[in-house]
């Protein structure tokens, strides 16, 4: 929770009626907040008529009294009021005046401080200037005390602050709203450790409340109880499962089991001092207010004067024995109406337990009157210990013992060992029959289950390869069709044979197979493509990257060009130092590929000479005739057959290109930098370069 700024507090105070604690004329007052128009009207009236006659000023307001107008002016609207931060001189003045007048005369102290009110001086002293106020960090013990006290007292910060010496009510409230409340709401508040002592609150009760009974402090369900004058007699009984186990073991050994009766438990009485205090408290002659102790479990215990420390020492000496409910039992005799009234009980000692166990065994050996036993679930006690309210314990009488000493146990205790159903990997019919027979042989549950119209095993079957392929490549239909095959079979147990027994040593396990395989694993869509087009053939890595890219580009262009690499082998040879890298060759070949095609087309359209030298053959020049050898590829022949069409198309396009018009003198002047401004800029550039040339070395631009 973020703290509010000073301006927000002043704005709220500006429009708030803060004179609600005045005692006079309470019926005729208007408790509505002052509006902005009323404040402006009051300022104007005070400037005009002064502060002498407040009744006359209040007559201008329909529902405001003279005291309200005066209070509003003096506490809120007075321009002489100082509402800013305190200075060191003001703090020192307040400390001196408190030493002189005490901490009660705040109105008198405020008269010595110009522009300050008594309320401001009081809050400044109690929150900041008081030397007893702690300004250190909050400890975990203080947080725990605030949390426990807030459960009982609520937002009564003044009373909570009395439990924390050195902390003010305002500091406690701010710490709760900013830190502890968030931790409690989110469950992040640390749980109470065993070493922490319980919190005790001292509350004073008036005399009139003594005869009416003590009420809960904060209405939060705190349990109010008086000190038990007579300790109740309780009995302990073992749980149901222990009874059944003891009965079965006794039958096997041939002995009759002894009923679980631990006898009566005598609890220690409270101290005599507490008895006297309780009797004095209950007597009608007492008129003084008494102090009550509120323990961490929200129990109110009467205590007076010096005996309070004795009661606290008694509880603190053995908190486990006083607060552990696991050692407590129930009353032995039920009421006639069938209801059981719970009463406070006290723990027992180990020596008493041994003596009473001895007595119970003797009583069990001798026949005696029938005793009604009570059965109690252990979870009930644990739930009751967590509860903060007074509740009755639900108890139901157990079955009576017969003449033989033991009766039939209840149906809940007739438990059989669960039979394990082992299904062998056989046919579906036999497996389903054996599974149904084994299910019928089991002990029926309390709630019958209706047979299902379908087999649950259809959700557990694994898909085969055909189903996977159909889901990956479904058929394109207007209506989606489910291609999964419904197989109604009984699920069998998974084969849990170890891998070293299931697979021989000669075979390779799946994980070893994948670890030894160096080839990357192909995803399923690529596997489908490989099945369609055939497996990939590994090809050796070729160093002729340029030729491979040429083949790809020519195949995409839909034509085949004649490679003339064999024509000039000497020109292609270069010196070892000037050899280009394959990347530069590829870059250049990609850029000059189109120029290569145009040059070949132009060379094919040139007319053949009448006589060719004998050393030059058509095959060496790169041309092929239609009647050449069959060794030429079909693509080369197709290229030669399609030559006349391309030539005609090229001639048509060139014939339609118009001749460019000659440039005029004005165009040349503008385009070639002959205007005045261009010449001026050129001259300036030359001058700049001439200046820089003497001081800087020229660098040539290398374009490669």
Swiss-Prot record:
Modified residues (Phosphoserine): 282, 396, 581
SMART domains xrefs: SANT
Keyword Phosphoprotein appears in the UniProt entry: yes
InterPro entries (UniProt xref): C-myb_C, Homeodomain-like_sf, Myb_dom, MYB_TF, SANT/Myb
Cellular component annotations (GO), alphabetically ordered: cytosol; Myb complex; nucleoplasm; nucleus
Post-translational modification: Phosphorylated by cyclin A/CDK2 during S-phase. Phosphorylation at Thr-524 is probably involved in transcriptional activity.
Compositional bias per record (Low complexity), positions renumbered to this chain: 339-366, 607-620
Main location: nucleus
Membrane-spanning ranges: none
Keyword vocabulary terms for this entry: DNA-binding, Isopeptide bond, Nucleus, Phosphoprotein, Repeat, Transcription, Transcription regulation, Ubl conjugation
Residues bearing PTM Phosphothreonine: 267, 443, 447, 490, 497, 524
Gene Ontology MF terms in the entry: DNA-binding transcription activator activity, RNA polymerase II-specific; RNA polymerase II cis-regulatory region sequence-specific DNA binding
One Pfam family linked to the record: Cmyb_C
Cross-link type Glycyl lysine isopeptide (Lys-Gly) (interchain with G-Cter in SUMO2), residue numbers: 104, 197, 275, 414, 450, 485, 502, 513, 527, 537, 550, 588, 600, 629, 643, 652
DNA-binding region residue numbers: 54-77, 106-129, 157-180
CDD domains the record matches: SANT (cd00167)
Subcellular location: Nucleus
Gene3D superfamilies associated with the record: Homeodomain-like
Subunit structure: Component of the DREAM complex (also named LINC complex) at least composed of E2F4, E2F5, LIN9, LIN37, LIN52, LIN54, MYBL1, MYBL2, RBL1, RBL2, RBBP4, TFDP1 and TFDP2. The complex exists in quiescent cells where it represses cell cycle-dependent genes. It dissociates in S phase when LIN9, LIN37, LIN52 and LIN54 form a subcomplex that binds to MYBL2. Interacts with CCNF (via the Cyclin N-terminal domain).
UniProt name for this protein: Myb-related protein B
Organism annotation: Mus musculus
Gene that encodes it: Mybl2
């Amino acid at each position: 929770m973020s703290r509010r700024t000073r301006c927000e507090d002043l704005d709220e105070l500006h429009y708030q009626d803060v004179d609600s604690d005045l005692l006079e004329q309470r019926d005729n007052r208007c408790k509505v907040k002052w509006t902005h128009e009323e404040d402006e009207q009051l300022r104007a009236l005070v400037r005009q008529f002064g502060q002498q006659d407040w009744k006359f000023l209040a007559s201008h307001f329909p529902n405001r009294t003279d005291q309200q107008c005066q209070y509003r002016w003096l506490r809120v609207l007075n321009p002489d009021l100082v509402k800013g931060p305190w200075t060191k001189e003001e703090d020192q003045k307040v400390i001196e005046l408190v030493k002189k007048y005490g901490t009660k005369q705040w109105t008198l102290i405020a008269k010595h401080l110009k522009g300050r009110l008594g309320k401001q001086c009081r809050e400044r002293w109690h929150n900041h200037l008081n030397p007893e106020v702690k300004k250190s960090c909050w400890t975990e013990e203080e947080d725990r005390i605030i949390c426990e006290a807030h459960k009982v007292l609520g937002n009564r910060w003044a009373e909570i602050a009395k439990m924390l010496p050195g902390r003010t009510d305002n500091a406690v409230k701010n710490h709760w709203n900013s830190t502890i409340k968030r931790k409690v709401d989110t469950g992040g508040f640390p749980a109470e450790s065993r070493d922490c002592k319980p919190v005790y609150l001292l509350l004073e009760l008036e005399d009139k409340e003594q005869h009416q009974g003590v009420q809960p402090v904060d209405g939060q369900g705190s349990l109010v109880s008086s000190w038990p004058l007579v300790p109740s007699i309780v009995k302990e009984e073992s749980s149901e499962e222990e009874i059944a186990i003891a009965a079965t073991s006794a039958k096997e050994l041939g002995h009759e089991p002894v009923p679980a009766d631990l006898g009566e438990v005598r609890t220690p009485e409270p101290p005599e001092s507490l008895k006297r205090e309780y009797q004095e408290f209950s007597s009608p002659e007492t008129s003084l207010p008494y102090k009550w102790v509120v323990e961490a479990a929200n129990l109110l215990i009467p205590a007076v004067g010096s005996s309070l420390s004795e009661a606290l020492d008694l509880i603190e000496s053995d908190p486990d024995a006083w607060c552990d409910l696991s050692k407590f039992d129930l009353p032995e005799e039920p009421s006639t109406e069938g209801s059981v009234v719970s009463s406070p009980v006290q723990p027992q000692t180990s020596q008493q337990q041994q003596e009473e166990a001895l007595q119970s065994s003797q009583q069990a050996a001798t026949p005696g009157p029938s005793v009604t036993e009570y059965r109690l679930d252990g979870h009930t006690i644990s739930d009751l210990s967590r509860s903060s309210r007074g509740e009755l314990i639900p108890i139901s009488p157990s079955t009576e013992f017969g003449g033989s000493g033991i009766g039939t146990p209840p149906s809940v205790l007739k438990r059989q060992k669960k039979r394990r159903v082992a299904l062998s990997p056989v046919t579906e019919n036999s497996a389903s029959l054996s599974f149904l027979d084994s299910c019928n042989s089991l002990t029926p549950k309390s709630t019958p289950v209706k047979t299902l119209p379908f087999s649950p095993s259809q959700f557990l079957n694994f898909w085969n390869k055909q189903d996977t392929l159909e889901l990956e490549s479904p058929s394109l239909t207007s209506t989606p069709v489910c291609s999964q095959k419904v197989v109604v079979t009984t699920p069998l147990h998974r084969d849990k044979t170890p891998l070293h027994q299931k697979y021989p040593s000669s075979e390779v396990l799946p994980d070893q197979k994948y670890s030894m395989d160096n080839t990357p694993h192909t995803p399923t869509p690529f596997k489908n493509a490989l099945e369609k087009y055939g497996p990939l053939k590994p090809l050796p890595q070729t160093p002729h990257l340029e030729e491979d890219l040429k083949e790809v580009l020519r195949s995409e262009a839909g034509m085949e060009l004649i490679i003339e690499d064999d024509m000039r082998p000497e020109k292609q040879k270069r010196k070892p130092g000037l050899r280009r890298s394959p990347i530069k060759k590829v870059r250049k070949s990609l850029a000059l590929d189109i120029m290569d095609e145009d040059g070949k087309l132009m060379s094919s359209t040139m007319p053949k000479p009448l006589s060719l030298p004998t050393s030059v053959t058509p095959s060496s020049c790169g041309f092929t005739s239609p009647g050449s050898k069959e060794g030429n590829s079909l693509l080369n022949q197709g290229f030669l057959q399609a030559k006349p069409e391309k030539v005609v198309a090229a001639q048509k396009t060139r014939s339609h290109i118009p001749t460019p018009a000659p440039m005029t003198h004005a165009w040349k002047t503008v385009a070639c930098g002959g205007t005045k401004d261009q010449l001026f800029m050129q001259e300036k550039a030359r001058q700049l370069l001439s200046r820089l040339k003497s001081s800087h070395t020229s660098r040539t631009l290398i374009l490669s």
